[in-house]
Amino acid sequence: MSESLRIIFAGTPDFAARHLDALLSSGHNVVGVFTQPDRPAGRGKKLMPSPVKVLAEEKGLPVFQPVSLRPQENQQLVADLQADVMVVVAYGLILPKAVLEMPRLGCINVHGSLLPRWRGAAPIQRSLWAGDAETGVTIMQMDVGLDTGDMLYKLSSPITAEDTSGTLYDKLAELGPQGLITTLKQLADGTAKPEVQDETLVTYAEKLSKEEARIDWSLSAAQLERCIRAFNPWPMSWLEIEGQPVKVWKASVIDTVTKSAPGTILEASKQGIQVATGDGILNLLSLQPAGKKAMSAQDLLNSRREWFVPGNRLA
């Protein structure tokens, strides 16, 4: 086996916890875990630990939860662990240059795209939103830029017509640990081959917002269908009817030319609610009114047919 490395792990959500779990089974020595401070969650706004903290405490690992790594005393926490490498997965804090240079082999990051495409905060969602044929994970050496470091290892996965951000998240949460363990072996053996990112191929994955997820009927049906999958499970595509938000869980594209204005309801039946768009027809299949569970178009029509009268326009 390769040399056992002393590793600091830094991460916060479930996606990161799956990588920590793989590390703990890999024969390497996780000497400390950094994660975001506990946050209020749920209706009672009770302070809740991150999935990474829960796993780390189960395994008896030292856990550190600084609000920032800029203060000298917090940087000293990293230095005192004398790590060979720091593994960063969806941590959520900026690592100052001093921290990046502390481990012997530096800091590496698992990023949810095939860099240099989709640097930034929402790579999984943006790959769907843009209609990419594939996505994947990139293990990269971290530097002070935003996802600009040299690439150490990549694994790809096709994007299917049924994928949502939720299903892609799960696929990449399986791929990421595989790539991470392989990269650590190469770093330990001295066989890693860093590859500089091609700046001419860079795209940026901007954060999602609830406002962006509001359905814009002037877009094409194909674009809107991709948005619905990209924004599932958050923030969820939505439209407004009688002042109420209605989430859209699933839709399909009907590739038919229509002269009706975008947003016009063309047909409402058990096969779906057909709406004119800027190009083509979007067939709404599964919706969720405020305060209700998601339901089929048929079930919603049974209770709210007046919302979907053909000829009316959706805002």
Curated annotation (Swiss-Prot):
(6S)-5,6,7,8-tetrahydrofolate binds at residues 113-116. It catalyses: L-methionyl-tRNA(fMet) + (6R)-10-formyltetrahydrofolate = N-formyl-L-methionyl-tRNA(fMet) + (6S)-5,6,7,8-tetrahydrofolate + H(+). The keyword Protein biosynthesis applies. Its EC number is 2.1.2.9. InterPro entries: Fmt, Formyl_trans_C, Formyl_trans_C_sf, Formyl_transf_N, Formyl_transf_N_sf, Formyl_transferase-like_C_sf, GART_AS, Met-tRNA-FMT_C. Coiled coil: none annotated. One of its GO terms (cellular component) is cytosol. Belongs to the Fmt family. Attaches a formyl group to the free amino group of methionyl-tRNA(fMet). The formyl group appears to play a dual role in the initiator identity of N-formylmethionyl-tRNA by promoting its recognition by IF2 and preventing the misappropriation of this tRNA by the elongation apparatus. This is Methionyl-tRNA formyltransferase. It comes from Escherichia coli (strain SMS-3-5 / SECEC).
